[in-house]
């Protein structure tokens, strides 16, 4: 007999893998669509968005990819400004280098920029700093280069930024901002196979029609949200995701609504979650060099959340996803919460086996709970079970709580290195004030010997090769037949209060993620080409003040 479930899964996987491949190059349909696109006229853009933009240098010229690109293009037109920008790029290259190569780069930088005859005058340094640099010994030079870097950045924030705002490059930035703000709905995407399900809906793979970019779409059922009082939680997750911009946390690209769902469009992580790799790929557990690499990236992600006054509350391998290259990101911020000044967190949240003692005893808690869960996750990556469960038989909820509160962690496997044992013990301290990451205000887990092989500056710059690269021909997700269907929710009606919340949720494209997509897929260069011709069609019937870009 024909296995229809297996056939459905094969068809879904084939379409999904084909879409992933096609996103790497322009198919005929994609080319046709892109030829119909054009930026709105400068006068329209200026009138629409100029008054709504905060003239903040960091936001426009550093954080927003299109703003950064256009600002660099502007700097290239003024020799003095270009000199400052080139110098800062050289300093950045020096900061990220290692060992003897770093020493050589410093010598080259000093010789080129500070010794007579220098290649252009760095006027922004000022007489005092210039004099100190000229008289400095080699051992003092790194500190002085960083001071020169600060002076260079301060210079670009002043006259160059003001001049940029009066240039055609800024007008072009406003055109892109107008494009960015057009309404988004489900017609802008192709939808592919379901990747998983959660408490309020499903996650499926989608593709932006006019760029080919692949994403994961978390579709939250409106009726199910209302029935379970989850509407505010969905809005909070969306608002937190908007604030987060880290290579170690999934990025939110779009937020929109359909008649039945609230949709969060986020980074598509094709490599599967760490739980899958621990239990389903090869021998159980993950080799130690991968554990160190993933743990380093996870630490960076958690520290980024904490810097924004956000407690994650659901750190576990299942919520850590791998991308095509083998880098990992934190996902599912549905339980994340913003810490309010002077207000304690008391609500119990998390997953059994990863919850800290202070959550289990219903005490006030804060950031240290994430570090406890981090310790559980490192242990699980190595041992293929969590530290307070019995690996050979099922542990009851009550026994798990007792062990978490009373038992010290033990390491029965030889795969635990001494550094791994130590970092687990420190993360799993019963009292939050004794826990690694929380002992003092500047207690940084990245300084632990467990991470001695990691250069975190290079890691954060994406310059460290992952120790494992997922197979691009494999779908790291359950068969669609294994993903249970939801039953229909009946008897739920929406009112004006619901409509207002849905509207707050549905804000369209998220600037940084959207701009990165436009640059990465080549659409930025294509639409900025002055010789480019625009043809009609390719808009799928959407009506907008400008041609649809998404």
Swiss-Prot record:
Main localization, broad class: membrane
Q: Which SUPFAM superfamilies match?
A: Protein kinase-like (PK-like), Regulator of G-protein signaling, RGS
**Propeptide stretches in the record:** 548-550
Q: Which residues does the UniProt record annotate as the domain RGS?
A: 57-174
Could you list the residues that carry lipid attachment of the S-geranylgeranyl cysteine kind. 547
EC number annotated for this UniProt entry: 2.7.11.14
Q: Quote the cellular component terms of the Gene Ontology held in the record.
A: cytoplasm; membrane
Please list the residue ranges annotated as the AGC-kinase C-terminal domain.
Answer: 452-517
- Locate the Phosphoserine modifications and list their residues: 36, 487
Positions binding ATP in this chain are 195-203, 218
Residue segments, region Disordered:
22-45, 531-550
Record PTM text = Autophosphorylated in vitro at Ser-487. Phosphorylation at Ser-36 is regulated by light and activated by cAMP.
Topology of this chain in the membrane: Lipid-anchor
**GO MF terms held by the record:** ATP binding; rhodopsin kinase activity
Reaction it catalyzes? L-threonyl-[rhodopsin] + ATP = O-phospho-L-threonyl-[rhodopsin] + ADP + H(+); L-seryl-[rhodopsin] + ATP = O-phospho-L-seryl-[rhodopsin] + ADP + H(+)
| Gene Ontology BP, a term | signal transduction
Name one matching Pfam family: RGS
Which SMART domains does this UniProt record tie to the protein? RGS (SM00315), S_TK_X (SM00133), S_TKc (SM00220)
Does the record's keyword annotation contain Nucleotide-binding? yes
What keywords is this UniProt entry annotated with?
Answer: ATP-binding, Kinase, Lipoprotein, Membrane, Methylation, Nucleotide-binding, Phosphoprotein, Prenylation, Sensory transduction, Serine/threonine-protein kinase, Transferase, Vision
Active-site residues from the entry: 314
Any extra remark in the record? Although the protein is present in a diversity of vertebrates ranging from bony fish to mammals, the mouse and rat orthologous proteins do not exist.
Its biological purpose: Retina-specific kinase involved in the shutoff of the photoresponse and adaptation to changing light conditions via cone opsin phosphorylation, including rhodopsin (RHO).
Q: What is this protein called?
A: Rhodopsin kinase grk7-b
Taxonomic source organism: Xenopus laevis (African clawed frog)
